């Protein structure tokens, strides 16, 4: 299992557009991928799960990936978070 933590810097947090990009990216991988915020974990392949967390600015999140392509999954998600301006 791999994990990585991030701090969200976008003023609006993880809103619909970047959430969709994260879900689409996570869905490309076979690994089980979860997002944790405030002690609650959701499936990163579920848009409803991601949106239900209400992740705002300055929030600390952790992404967990477990499976055969876990390293690639974490790298791809890190790229999306950066490209979408959610993290530094």
Curated annotation (Swiss-Prot):
**UniProt KW keywords:** Cytoplasm, Phosphoprotein, Phosphotransferase system, Sugar transport, Transport
| Signal peptide (from-to) | none
Q: Which GO terms describe its biological process?
A: phosphoenolpyruvate-dependent sugar phosphotransferase system
Sites of Phosphoserine modification: 46
Which residues are in the HPr domain?
1-88
Q: What is its main location?
A: cytoplasm
Subcellular locations according to the entry: Cytoplasm
Q: What does this protein do?
A: General (non sugar-specific) component of the phosphoenolpyruvate-dependent sugar phosphotransferase system (sugar PTS). This major carbohydrate active-transport system catalyzes the phosphorylation of incoming sugar substrates concomitantly with their translocation across the cell membrane. The phosphoryl group from phosphoenolpyruvate (PEP) is transferred to the phosphoryl carrier protein HPr by enzyme I. Phospho-HPr then transfers it to the PTS EIIA domain.
Which family, according to UniProt? Belongs to the HPr family.
Q: Under what name is this protein listed?
A: Phosphocarrier protein HPr
